[in-house]
Amino acid sequence: MQAIPVSIFMRLLFSLTVLSLFFATSVKAEDSRTVETKFGPVTITGEPQRVVTLYEGALDASYAVGAKPLGAVITRGGDNVAGYLQDKAKGIALVGTSQENNLEAIIALQPDLILAANTLPEQQYRLLSRVAPTVASGVGMFEEEAWRKEAKLFATALGKLHLMEEALAELDERIAQVKALVETKTPEDQRTALLARWMPQGPVVLSKHLFTTSLLSEVGFAVEDGDVIKSGRPHSSPLSQEKLSLLDKDWLFMATINQDGKDALAAAERSPAYQRLQVVKNQQVVPVDGHVWSSASGVLAAGVILDDVEKALNAAP
């Protein structure tokens, strides 16, 4: 994140102060609630109507409980929100990426609530919180059930926790259904699985402690990550051709996020090293959408992932 020049910072600070005074005098006297965030407790009054999300998980949570955010960030490696949300997000304003938000675009939307990721810098938080209550997740990436905790956090901020609890209960029923299918379709000793994302430089292995891989574990797969991921990192460095054997599990879920990745994967699929993999010979490499499988999180993304797993199991030889 680039530093904000002092002149721009002061101009934004003045604008934000004026806006904060406006919102402070126009809020209705309604029930308030306090949520714990990365930067301390934040109090929210009423049911927000002008929500801006700066994190894909927050956008997913918003739609899962029926909220309609005005702004969102572009998905990783794309030019819009993730494909699985685009039908719901028609007309939404794009306010940057998860790495670099457009502060002026956010301010222009006059939000009454801003939802952000754990990675939001404190300087930006200070600016945004002058516009509207800003909820930055304090949940660590590798915490147990991190995505569920975040979903409940954002739903609480939206005043719709009861709807999120209902959505999670329905999802748990779906998880149980897919788990039963895994147990029916695959022998107990043939359930090892790995999630990789193919990049132009080669495949990266994703940690077994992330949103998607935790879902795979919940439905009965023995998820591995090849012991090639450094502590605190979500994925490995790109693997060389000589190390492709690390991908050779009973099931390989292979994600791509753009055309460059797809082209690189297509070239690799013709290589002897790739064709020697037993998982390839067994036809149990499952191509998946990297925007969902390696970037998204939340109830709606989980539904897409479970559908993909179900289709793969039913299509397996």
Predicted regions and their residues:
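Bacterial N-terminal signal peptides that target proteins for export
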Residues: 2-14
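Structured C-terminal subdomain patch of bacterial secreted/periplasmic proteins
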Residues: 250-317
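Cleavable N-terminal signal peptides
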Residues: 16-17, 27, 244
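A short, structured surface patch at a secondary-structure boundary
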Residues: 56-105
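Proline-aspartate-enriched helix->loop->beta-strand connector
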Residues: 110-115, 133, 244, 248-252
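Basic- and aromatic-lined ligand-binding clefts that recognize polyanionic substrates
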Residues: 50-54, 58-62, 164-225
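Sec/Tat signal peptide C-region and signal peptidase I cleavage site
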Residues: 23-29
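Extracytoplasmic substrate-binding proteins
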Residues: 41, 123-200, 284, 292-317
